[in-house]
Amino acid sequence: MSLVSAALFGLLQALTEFLPVSSTAHLLVFGELLGHSLDDRRFRAFVTIIQAGTTLAVLVYFRADIARLVAAAARGLARGRPFGTPEARLGWYIVLGTVPAALAGKLLEHRIEALGNWVIAGSLVALGLVLLAAERLASHRRRVEDVGAGDALLIGVAQALALVPGSSRSGTTITGGMLLGFTREAAARFSFLLSVPITLAAGAYKLWSTVPDLRGEAAWTVATVVGTVVSAVAGYLVIDWLLAWLRTRTTYVFVVWRLAAGAAIAALILSGVLPAGAEAPPPPPPALHAAP
C-alpha cells in the first residue's frame, strides 16, 4: 500500500468513525475498489490498527471529562456512595451502557463477520431512515446531565446494534439518544463517552491478535503508522467539528449521506463491481471495534 493510500484510509476512518455514516461500510468498499482484499492478513491488520488512532482522538478530546468522571466514581466508591454525585452516576451509567455491546460482541462476533455487502447497503438505508425519524419526531431537549440508568442501557443496546456492518456505532447511539429526547449535541457527546470503554477493550484485543501479521512487512508497517497518525489527528478535528455542527444544525445531511451510500453500494453489487456475499469476514465494527 502506498503512503498516499494509507493517508486516505486514515482520513476516511476519521470521518466515518465519528460521523453517523458507518466507517465499516466505507472502509470495506473503498478497500474493495482499490483492490485490497480482506483475505490479505496485512490489509486486515492495517484496517484494524488505524482505528486505534480514532480511539486516541476520543481520549485526548474528552480527557478532562474522562478524568472528572473517573475521579468522581472513585471518590464515590471510597466514601461508600458510588452514586452520590451527578458525575459519579454518569460514570457508572457509561459502564452500564457498555454491557450490551460487550455481551453481543462476545456472543455474535463470528456470525456478524459472515454478513455480506447487501447487509451493509441495507443497514445504511435502514438506519438512515431511523435517524430521519429521530430528527423529525424527537423533542431534542434533554442534556447529558439528564442521562439515567434506563437511558444508558437503551443507548447501550443501540451501541450493540453497531456490530452489524453498515449500521455505525456513532449512528446507532446518536440516533438512540435523540429518540430518547436528548439534544443532538448531548446525544453525540454521550455517544463519544460511551465509546471509550468498549473501543479500548476491543481495540486492545484486536491489536494483540493482528499486530503479528505485520512482522517482516516494512512497507505495510510504515503505511499503518501513517494511517494511524492521520486518523488520530483528523479524528480530533472531526469530533470538534461535529459537536459544533450539531449545536445549531440538524442531522439531515447524514441521512442523505447514508441513503446515497446504501444506494451506491447496492448499484455496485448489481453491476458486479462488488461481491454480494462476504468472501472474507469484514473488520469488526469500529466501535467494538464496531461499525460506526
UniProtKB/Swiss-Prot annotation:
In terms of superkingdom, the source organism counts as: Bacteria
- For this protein, what is any one GO molecular function term? undecaprenyl-diphosphatase activity
Main localization category: membrane
Q: What topology does it adopt in the membrane?
A: Multi-pass membrane protein
Task: Cite the EC number.
Answer: 3.6.1.27
Q: Which InterPro entries match?
A: UppP
Q: Which GO terms describe its biological process?
A: cell wall organization; peptidoglycan biosynthetic process; regulation of cell shape; response to antibiotic
Q: Which residues form a coiled coil?
A: none
Q: Which UniProt keywords apply?
A: Antibiotic resistance, Cell inner membrane, Cell membrane, Cell shape, Cell wall biogenesis/degradation, Hydrolase, Membrane, Peptidoglycan synthesis, Transmembrane, Transmembrane helix
Where in the cell?
A: Cell inner membrane
- Write out the GO cellular component annotations: plasma membrane
Report TM segments: 1-21, 46-66, 90-110, 114-134, 192-212, 225-245, 253-273
Question: What does the sequence similarity comment in the record state about its family?
Answer: Belongs to the UppP family.
User: What does this protein do, in the record's words?
Assistant: Catalyzes the dephosphorylation of undecaprenyl diphosphate (UPP). Confers resistance to bacitracin.
**Alphabetized PANTHER family for the sequence:** UNDECAPRENYL-DIPHOSPHATASE
Record protein name field? Undecaprenyl-diphosphatase
Annotated source species:
Anaeromyxobacter dehalogenans (strain 2CP-1 / ATCC BAA-258)
